[in-house]
């Protein structure tokens, strides 16, 4: 099966289960979890069912294409269902059947593997899904994001499309065996990008510049999340300017949080990516590592807290009644 067909089939399957098929986020992330449609939307009471492909960058995982199934940039297919359906495991097994796997004929195992992302203050209980001895999916019930409780708990399913294609076709290498479609190979689409970024990540990236960038992105994220914005009911917009209007201001549940959460979160993601580049360059000591992780987590948490403000009225009304 080609990568393209794999993605099309997953899109069709999860759309039929009620998921909106979204697009990849355009900021460097280390996993589909960091896409704001997961990282922010798993918080709060509102139902949220989405699926999307996300290119994921993990600079330290590069192997100059010498490893047939490991790279610094690869794809994840992410599914979020909130609240988690009671039959989510059956839905997942159905997705494997839709891809052409015979789950009854293959050795499919759910291996307990509780998940944690320290830099995002995120975690949950879950499993790795293994088929015939190879990991194909991470399955998580989110309990925390940004150090805040996820209520209701939502289900996250993260597929590795490249590996699924190889297993389905009984092949072994991204770089020699995998096709993107009928006319373009995975190697043609990804090889030069992968090789050149490996050289940059491990040999060329300026650590002095990266340390400065981390500080700059961190400070800008702090400044942006603390910037006062107001809702202008006349114009129907958020603004930093004065608002003079006789129209009532809608509740926060309609206008969203009165803060620039998404721009501040983008900057937090940039901090995370810069940290990962520094880690690949070997510029982060063991003692520094915890400090940098805490700094990234602080930025993510600040964004999550502001995002949650839109639900305060709802919570207070519920308590009053």
Task: List PLM regions with ranges.
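Terminal leader/tail segments of proteins
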Residues: 315-316, 320-321
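Structured aminoacyl-transfer and RNA-binding surfaces used for tRNA recognition/handling
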Residues: 1-315
